Amino acid sequence: LKKYFLLFVLACASFMAKAQSGFNYYEWGVGFGASYGRGFDDLNRQVWHPGGGLNLTYNYSPYVPMSLEFQFGTLEGGGRTPDKDQFGRYSKNNYKALVLHADLQLGEIIDYDNSGFLNVIKNFYGGAGIGAISNSMKDIQRTNLYLFNGPDTYVFPGKSKSVNLMVPLRFGYEFKIYDDYDQVGYTITLGYQHSYTFGEGLDGYNDNTQKFKNNAPDQFAMFTIGFKYNFGNTVSYTKLVRNFR
Protein backbone atom coordinates (compact mmCIF):
# COMPACT_ATOMS: atom_id res chain seq x y z
CA LEU A 1 0.00 0.00 0.00
CA LYS A 2 2.83 2.38 0.86
CA LYS A 3 4.39 1.63 -2.51
CA TYR A 4 1.24 2.60 -4.42
CA PHE A 5 0.75 5.70 -2.27
CA LEU A 6 4.33 6.82 -3.01
CA LEU A 7 3.79 6.28 -6.74
CA PHE A 8 0.58 8.32 -6.54
CA VAL A 9 2.39 11.20 -4.80
CA LEU A 10 5.20 11.15 -7.36
CA ALA A 11 2.70 11.10 -10.22
CA CYS A 12 0.83 14.10 -8.76
CA ALA A 13 4.08 16.00 -8.26
CA SER A 14 5.12 15.26 -11.83
CA PHE A 15 1.73 16.39 -13.16
CA MET A 16 1.85 19.63 -11.17
CA ALA A 17 5.40 20.37 -12.34
CA LYS A 18 4.36 19.75 -15.96
CA ALA A 19 1.30 21.94 -15.51
CA GLN A 20 3.55 24.79 -14.37
CA SER A 21 5.98 24.30 -17.26
CA GLY A 22 6.25 27.53 -19.24
CA PHE A 23 4.71 29.72 -16.52
CA ASN A 24 7.81 30.16 -14.34
CA TYR A 25 10.63 32.69 -14.52
CA TYR A 26 13.81 33.52 -12.64
CA GLU A 27 13.79 36.43 -10.22
CA TRP A 28 17.26 37.84 -10.96
CA GLY A 29 19.55 38.45 -13.91
CA VAL A 30 23.07 39.70 -14.58
CA GLY A 31 24.36 40.90 -17.91
CA PHE A 32 26.66 42.95 -20.07
CA GLY A 33 26.35 44.86 -23.30
CA ALA A 34 27.97 46.92 -26.02
CA SER A 35 26.85 50.26 -27.41
CA TYR A 36 27.58 52.70 -30.22
CA GLY A 37 26.75 56.29 -29.39
CA ARG A 38 27.18 60.02 -29.94
CA GLY A 39 26.34 63.28 -28.24
CA PHE A 40 23.75 65.97 -28.94
CA ASP A 41 25.23 69.04 -27.28
CA ASP A 42 26.65 72.50 -28.05
CA LEU A 43 29.01 71.19 -30.75
CA ASN A 44 27.46 70.53 -34.15
CA ARG A 45 29.96 67.93 -35.36
CA GLN A 46 29.74 64.66 -33.44
CA VAL A 47 31.78 61.45 -33.64
CA TRP A 48 30.32 58.00 -32.99
CA HIS A 49 32.16 55.82 -30.47
CA PRO A 50 31.73 52.32 -28.99
CA GLY A 51 30.90 51.85 -25.32
CA GLY A 52 29.72 49.21 -22.91
CA GLY A 53 27.78 48.40 -19.77
CA LEU A 54 27.22 45.95 -16.91
CA ASN A 55 23.90 45.40 -15.17
CA LEU A 56 22.13 43.63 -12.33
CA THR A 57 18.42 43.03 -12.95
CA TYR A 58 15.44 42.25 -10.73
CA ASN A 59 12.70 40.63 -12.81
CA TYR A 60 9.47 42.00 -11.34
CA SER A 61 7.81 39.81 -13.97
CA PRO A 62 9.02 38.15 -17.19
CA TYR A 63 8.12 41.39 -18.97
CA VAL A 64 9.12 44.04 -16.40
CA PRO A 65 12.87 44.00 -15.73
CA MET A 66 14.26 46.61 -13.32
CA SER A 67 18.02 47.13 -13.69
CA LEU A 68 20.90 48.91 -12.03
CA GLU A 69 23.38 49.53 -14.83
CA PHE A 70 26.92 50.86 -15.06
CA GLN A 71 27.60 52.46 -18.45
CA PHE A 72 30.80 53.81 -19.96
CA GLY A 73 31.89 55.28 -23.27
CA THR A 74 33.25 58.29 -25.16
CA LEU A 75 31.53 61.42 -26.45
CA GLU A 76 33.51 63.49 -28.95
CA GLY A 77 32.53 66.63 -30.80
CA GLY A 78 33.75 69.72 -32.61
CA GLY A 79 37.24 70.17 -34.02
CA ARG A 80 40.16 72.56 -34.02
CA THR A 81 39.68 73.57 -37.67
CA PRO A 82 36.94 75.97 -38.90
CA ASP A 83 35.29 73.30 -41.05
CA LYS A 84 34.57 71.29 -37.89
CA ASP A 85 33.77 74.15 -35.51
CA GLN A 86 33.68 77.88 -36.27
CA PHE A 87 35.45 78.71 -33.01
CA GLY A 88 37.85 75.76 -32.94
CA ARG A 89 36.08 74.19 -29.98
CA TYR A 90 36.77 70.49 -29.44
CA SER A 91 36.09 68.07 -26.60
CA LYS A 92 36.49 64.37 -25.89
CA ASN A 93 34.62 63.07 -22.86
CA ASN A 94 35.37 59.67 -21.33
CA TYR A 95 32.20 59.27 -19.29
CA LYS A 96 30.88 56.82 -16.72
CA ALA A 97 27.23 56.58 -15.66
CA LEU A 98 25.19 54.73 -13.07
CA VAL A 99 21.54 54.32 -14.06
CA LEU A 100 18.45 52.75 -12.51
CA HIS A 101 15.86 51.93 -15.18
CA ALA A 102 12.76 49.81 -15.75
CA ASP A 103 11.30 48.48 -18.99
CA LEU A 104 7.73 47.48 -19.82
CA GLN A 105 7.33 44.81 -22.50
CA LEU A 106 4.08 44.39 -24.40
CA GLY A 107 3.66 40.89 -22.95
CA GLU A 108 2.76 42.45 -19.61
CA ILE A 109 -0.33 44.21 -20.97
CA ILE A 110 -1.59 42.13 -23.93
CA ASP A 111 -3.23 38.71 -24.17
CA TYR A 112 -0.95 36.78 -26.51
CA ASP A 113 -2.07 33.23 -25.63
CA ASN A 114 -3.65 32.18 -28.94
CA SER A 115 -1.77 34.36 -31.40
CA GLY A 116 1.55 33.62 -33.05
CA PHE A 117 1.89 37.26 -34.09
CA LEU A 118 1.29 38.59 -30.57
CA ASN A 119 3.76 36.04 -29.20
CA VAL A 120 6.39 37.67 -31.40
CA ILE A 121 5.63 41.32 -30.63
CA LYS A 122 5.16 40.70 -26.88
CA ASN A 123 8.91 41.22 -26.41
CA PHE A 124 8.99 44.82 -27.68
CA TYR A 125 9.62 47.21 -24.80
CA GLY A 126 9.78 50.84 -23.77
CA GLY A 127 11.31 52.16 -20.59
CA ALA A 128 12.80 55.03 -18.65
CA GLY A 129 15.03 55.63 -15.69
CA ILE A 130 17.15 58.03 -13.69
CA GLY A 131 20.84 58.18 -12.99
CA ALA A 132 24.02 60.21 -12.83
CA ILE A 133 26.76 60.66 -15.42
CA SER A 134 30.35 61.52 -14.51
CA ASN A 135 32.03 63.59 -17.23
CA SER A 136 35.81 63.64 -17.63
CA MET A 137 37.39 65.55 -20.52
CA LYS A 138 40.32 63.64 -21.97
CA ASP A 139 40.91 66.56 -24.33
CA ILE A 140 39.25 69.99 -24.63
CA GLN A 141 40.07 73.26 -26.39
CA ARG A 142 39.54 76.07 -23.88
CA THR A 143 40.85 79.14 -25.77
CA ASN A 144 39.75 80.81 -29.00
CA LEU A 145 41.92 79.71 -31.95
CA TYR A 146 40.78 82.21 -34.60
CA LEU A 147 41.18 85.98 -34.29
CA PHE A 148 38.20 86.69 -36.55
CA ASN A 149 36.05 85.37 -33.67
CA GLY A 150 37.73 87.58 -31.06
CA PRO A 151 40.94 87.70 -29.03
CA ASP A 152 42.93 84.51 -28.49
CA THR A 153 42.86 85.24 -24.77
CA TYR A 154 39.15 84.39 -24.63
CA VAL A 155 38.51 81.28 -22.54
CA PHE A 156 35.42 79.20 -23.25
CA PRO A 157 33.61 78.72 -19.92
CA GLY A 158 32.78 75.26 -18.60
CA LYS A 159 34.09 72.41 -16.49
CA SER A 160 36.46 69.63 -17.49
CA LYS A 161 35.04 67.35 -14.79
CA SER A 162 31.42 67.32 -13.65
CA VAL A 163 28.52 65.13 -12.58
CA ASN A 164 25.04 65.59 -14.07
CA LEU A 165 21.66 64.04 -13.40
CA MET A 166 20.38 62.08 -16.41
CA VAL A 167 17.08 60.58 -17.58
CA PRO A 168 17.32 57.80 -20.20
CA LEU A 169 14.46 56.80 -22.50
CA ARG A 170 14.73 53.27 -23.87
CA PHE A 171 13.15 51.26 -26.71
CA GLY A 172 13.95 47.85 -28.13
CA TYR A 173 13.28 44.14 -28.47
CA GLU A 174 14.27 41.22 -26.24
CA PHE A 175 14.95 37.73 -27.61
CA LYS A 176 14.16 35.13 -24.93
CA ILE A 177 16.17 31.87 -24.83
CA TYR A 178 14.60 29.07 -22.78
CA ASP A 179 16.48 26.49 -20.70
CA ASP A 180 15.67 22.82 -20.00
CA TYR A 181 13.07 23.91 -17.41
CA ASP A 182 11.14 25.97 -20.00
CA GLN A 183 12.17 29.17 -18.21
CA VAL A 184 13.89 32.18 -19.73
CA GLY A 185 17.50 31.33 -18.96
CA TYR A 186 19.11 33.91 -21.23
CA THR A 187 18.12 37.01 -23.18
CA ILE A 188 19.62 38.98 -26.05
CA THR A 189 18.41 42.57 -26.33
CA LEU A 190 18.61 45.02 -29.22
CA GLY A 191 17.80 48.57 -28.21
CA TYR A 192 18.09 52.32 -28.51
CA GLN A 193 18.64 54.70 -25.60
CA HIS A 194 18.33 58.49 -25.67
CA SER A 195 19.46 60.26 -22.50
CA TYR A 196 18.72 63.81 -21.36
CA THR A 197 21.10 65.41 -18.88
CA PHE A 198 20.49 68.27 -16.47
CA GLY A 199 23.56 70.44 -16.95
CA GLU A 200 26.23 71.41 -19.47
CA GLY A 201 28.80 68.74 -18.73
CA LEU A 202 28.77 66.41 -21.74
CA ASP A 203 30.97 68.62 -23.93
CA GLY A 204 32.61 70.65 -21.15
CA TYR A 205 31.30 73.96 -22.51
CA ASN A 206 28.82 76.33 -20.88
CA ASP A 207 28.90 79.14 -23.41
CA ASN A 208 27.04 82.44 -23.40
CA THR A 209 23.66 81.80 -25.05
CA GLN A 210 23.72 85.27 -26.67
CA LYS A 211 26.77 84.37 -28.74
CA PHE A 212 26.59 80.58 -29.03
CA LYS A 213 23.84 78.10 -29.75
CA ASN A 214 23.08 76.73 -26.31
CA ASN A 215 19.31 76.50 -26.07
CA ALA A 216 18.76 72.82 -25.15
CA PRO A 217 20.01 70.44 -22.47
CA ASP A 218 22.95 68.24 -23.37
CA GLN A 219 21.86 64.82 -24.64
CA PHE A 220 23.44 61.63 -25.93
CA ALA A 221 22.13 58.56 -27.71
CA MET A 222 23.28 55.00 -28.32
CA PHE A 223 22.33 51.81 -30.08
CA THR A 224 22.80 48.82 -27.80
CA ILE A 225 23.09 45.05 -27.80
CA GLY A 226 22.98 43.16 -24.52
CA PHE A 227 23.21 39.65 -23.09
CA LYS A 228 21.66 38.60 -19.77
CA TYR A 229 21.84 35.41 -17.70
CA ASN A 230 18.85 34.79 -15.42
CA PHE A 231 19.14 33.01 -12.08
CA GLY A 232 17.78 32.84 -8.53
CA ASN A 233 14.36 31.99 -7.16
CA THR A 234 11.75 30.54 -9.50
CA VAL A 235 8.54 32.58 -9.55
CA SER A 236 5.22 31.63 -11.14
CA TYR A 237 3.63 34.06 -13.60
CA THR A 238 -0.09 34.43 -14.34
CA LYS A 239 0.31 33.82 -18.08
CA LEU A 240 2.17 31.23 -20.12
CA VAL A 241 5.57 32.76 -20.88
CA ARG A 242 6.73 30.18 -23.41
CA ASN A 243 4.68 29.40 -26.48
CA PHE A 244 4.97 25.65 -27.18
CA ARG A 245 3.14 25.79 -30.51
How should these model regions be labeled?
Residues 19-59, 228:
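Short glycine/proline- and aromatic-enriched beta-strand/turn motifs that initiate or cap beta-hairpins
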Residues 20-27, 63, 108-122, 177-186, ...:
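Short loop/turn motifs that connect adjacent beta-strands in outer-membrane beta-barrel proteins
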Residues 32-36, 54-58, 100-104, 128-132, ...:
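Residues on the lipid-exposed face of transmembrane beta-strands in outer-membrane beta-barrel proteins
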